[in-house]
Every structure is written in C-alpha cells, then in structure tokens.
Design a protein with these regions (language model features):
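Blade-level signature of beta-propeller repeat domains, shared across WD40, Kelch, NHL, RCC1
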Residues: 356-409
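Fungal secretory targeting signals
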Residues: 1-19
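Beta-propeller blade signature
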Residues: 69-77, 143-157, 208-216, 381-399
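Beta-strand-rich domains and repeat architectures in extracellular enzymes and scaffolds
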Residues: 30-69
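Short loop/turn segments immediately following the C-termini of beta-strands
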Residues: 60-62, 130, 200-203, 213, ...
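Blade-loop segments of beta-propeller domains
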Residues: 43, 70, 74-126, 130-137, ...
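Surface-exposed loop and turn segments in beta-propeller and other repeat-based domains
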Residues: 32-36, 78-109, 157-174, 218-250, ...
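Beta-rich, blade/repeat-based domains predominating
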Residues: 40-51, 103-128, 133, 168-198, ...
Length: 409
C-alpha cells in the first residue's frame, strides 16, 4: 500500500471522528431558574417568602466583623434591616469582651446571630437566633439571652412571642441552625404548637430541640445519635474540588444535623447532616414523647431513607415532596416518601451550595446559593467566594404550593 494512500485514509478517519459528536453531560435539567435577587454585600443563609410576597433574609455573623444587621427584608430590590436597625444592634456589640475568652452578647431584646427565618401556616414570621458570633478565635460561646426563638406579626411588625433557651436546652457551644413549625393545637397542653430545631454544634453536641410554643419548654432529642452527626471521614466534592475544613492540616468536613423538613401532615420529621449524603426520618410522636425510656424508643424508630446527595437545607411542598440540594451534582433533588425514590428536580451549573429552600404560596420553590464551601474556613484562610450571592426560584411540579392546611387536628 502506498504511503500517500495510508496518510489519506488516516486523515479521513480523523476527520470523521472529529465530526462525530461525543456524548456529554448536558449540565441542565428541569425548569429554568429565575433570578430573584443578587446579594452584593452581606453573606446570607436563610430566608422565607410570606403569603403577601415579602422576602425576609438572615445574615449570620459566622465570619468576624462581617455584618451590620442579622435580619433584613428585600424592599424595592434593596436589603434593609428588619424590623429595624435598633433591634439588630446589641448594646456594646455582638461580642462581650469582658469575658475571657470573649462570649457572644446576652441581650434578650436584640438579635445576635440569626441563622434561620421561616413563616408559619398563619403567615407569621419566626426568627431563630443562634446567639453565637464569630470572633478572631472562632465561634464564641453563647450566654443566656442570646439563643432564642422570636415570633413576629407581619401586619404590624411586632413581636408576639419570645422564647429564651437556657443551657439545658441549648448548651453554650450549641448552634441552633434550622427550624420548622407545627401549629397543631393537639400536640402540646398549651395548644400553641411545636417548633423542631436542628442543633449542629460545631463542637459535636448535636441534637433535635423540641419546643412547646406556648410554655417555652424545650427538650433535646437524639443527642449525639449517628444519624444527626457528621459521617466519619466525609469529604464533599464540589465543582471538581475536594473540600476539607481547617481545624487541622487534614480535617474532614464535620457538620452535623442541618436540614430539617416536616411532612405535609406533620407526622414525620425528615433531617440530614451536612457532613454526609443520607436522609433520615422519624415520626414526630416519638420526638414529642417525654416519658421514661422515650429516648431509647425514639432512637429505635429512626428511618434510614437512603442517599440523596450532599444537602444543607430541606423543604416540603403540599404534595409531600421533600426537596434538598445535591451540591456535588449542581442540582436540587426531590424525594417521594410514598415510593422512596430520590430524583433530580433541577440542575444548573450555577448551583453549588444550595443553602436554604422555601416553598411559597405562589407555587414556586425559592432557594439561595451562597458559596459556603468557598469560605475561608475551608481554604486555609483564603476567601474564594465571589459576589454576588444569589436567590433563584423554579416552578413546582404538579401544582405544589406551601403547606397551608391544618395538620392532624
């Protein structure tokens, strides 16, 4: 065979190969994202959308000297303190330097370090104040008066409930993270409903805190259980990079129970550690049980629901679908409790750390992308976050909306 013919044949083969499309990941799936707001200033985590369309946002002081106010509202495209700047400004600052080491402010009448906000089925706003603030040495411990749950009437922006947590409910190194409200009057003697709160203490003192919204009585459940703890040796991979924490030269990503969500009828609490990929559930009747041996019984009733990817927050719609981020897949997943199936709901290259999700009465799932995994605590003190942070929304499937009907009355 002549060399010139061989060369011609080879070139034809290469040309055909180049012209043939190689299968690749499309990178997107599901409904298109709508951009709701871009955050160019303070770093956010939680938010909620009221029935009237008002959007409330919280900015936790988990990085030193990072915020001017810890709860805000988006008004005409601007973020303003909510309900005002005064309540967001503790006298003497957020840190108490009269103690050694410094502790977080203990002001009962001011917002210290809000980590979550949520609206209930009566369209009232609940503000969860962790009471913890970052110093240059790390997260300062709390003092009584800091950790609290505040209820706000949105009509007049006034406080109707304030529950302070002592250290039997929330230890000084606890970190209240997320909250869900069930207003079913049959759940407690007070008839005012219950709050379920995740405590993902960085020091490892994890728990689910159950609060009677009438009496303010609070109890810690499933303390330190493996299901609410970071999975040993867990390393997330986001945008092709392994993410470690900086507590030592090589430290795994150790974050305990974070996201929680109630089933539409309030009978089950779903939850997940951020330091893992598993989803868990437990019937709320076991969390509400304070009888002898109730702790042993509740631990035996934990449901292991399988892997759903790495998630931070969780959320429920009126069809009882459970939604959560899947950071390693640039996606949001949908879990169907009836079938036990987890499926991607939406994918987009802009997704990386889907922090908080909120289903609204308008039939949309709102969520925030805050680049937490690019924060200095994971990259040797180098801040790799690039503003703006973002809030998006997507239309829910099958007519899903915010859960609004009474639960189990």
């Amino acid at each position: 065979m002549k060399p010139s013919f061989v060369i011609s044949l080879t070139l034809c083969s290469i040309s055909a190969a180049v012209g043939q499309e190689i299968l690749s990941d499309p990178g997107t799936l599901g409904p298109a994202l709508e951009t709701i707001h871009l955050f160019y200033d303070q770093w956010l985590t939680g938010f909620t959308v009221s029935a009237s369309g008002h959007i409330f946002v919280n900015y936790p002081p988990v990085f030193p000297n990072s915020i001017n106010f810890t709860v805000g509202e988006i008004v005409n495209g601007r973020e303003v303190p909510y309900p005002n700047l005064e309540i967001n400004t503790p006298p003497g600052g957020r840190l108490n330097y009269s103690t050694n080491p410094p502790t977080s402010s203990n002001s009962e009448d001011h917002l210290i370090g809000v980590i979550s906000v949520i609206t209930d089925t009566e369209d009232r706003l609940w503000i969860l104040d962790s009471g913890r603030v970052a110093s240059t040495e790390g997260l300062a411990e709390t003092a009584y008066g800091g950790p609290k749950l505040i209820g706000m009437h949105l009509t007049h922006n006034t406080i109707f409930k304030k529950i302070l947590f002592d250290q039997t409910a929330v230890p000084a190194d606890g970190y209240l993270n997320d909250v869900r409200i069930d207003l079913n009057p049959a759940l407690t003697p007070s008839g005012q409903g219950v709050a379920y709160i995740s405590d993902n203490s960085p020091e490892g003192r994890t728990a689910i805190v159950v609060v009677d919204l009438g009496s303010g009585a609070a109890s810690r459940k499933l303390v330190g259980d493996p299901s609410i703890s970071s999975h040993p040796g867990f390393v997330p991979f986001i945008w092709g990079e392994a993410v470690y924490s900086n507590s030592s030269s090589i430290s795994h990503f150790s974050v305990g129970v974070d996201g929680i969500a109630l089933s539409a009828d309030g009978s089950t609490l779903y939850y997940c550690p951020a330091g893992g990929r598993s989803l868990y559930g437990i019937e709320t009747k076991y969390l509400l049980d304070n009888s002898h041996n109730s702790d042993v019984l509740s631990r035996s009733q934990i449901q292991v629901l399988g892997d759903k990817g790495l998630s931070d927050g969780l959320e429920t719609d009126s069809n009882n679908n459970i939604y959560g981020g899947n950071m390693e897949d640039n996606s949001i997943i949908k879990f169907n409790p009836k079938t036990g199936l987890v499926q991607p709901f939406v994918r987009d290259p802009r997704l990386s750390w889907t922090d908080t999700l909120s289903v609204a009465t308008d039939g949309y799932l709102y969520f925030t992308e805050n680049q937490l995994w690019r924060a200095p605590i994971y990259w040797g003190g180098i801040d790799r976050r690039v503003k703006p942070y973002a809030m998006f929304r997507v239309k829910l499937p099958d007519g899903g909306v915010k859960v609004s009907r009474p639960r189990r009355e």
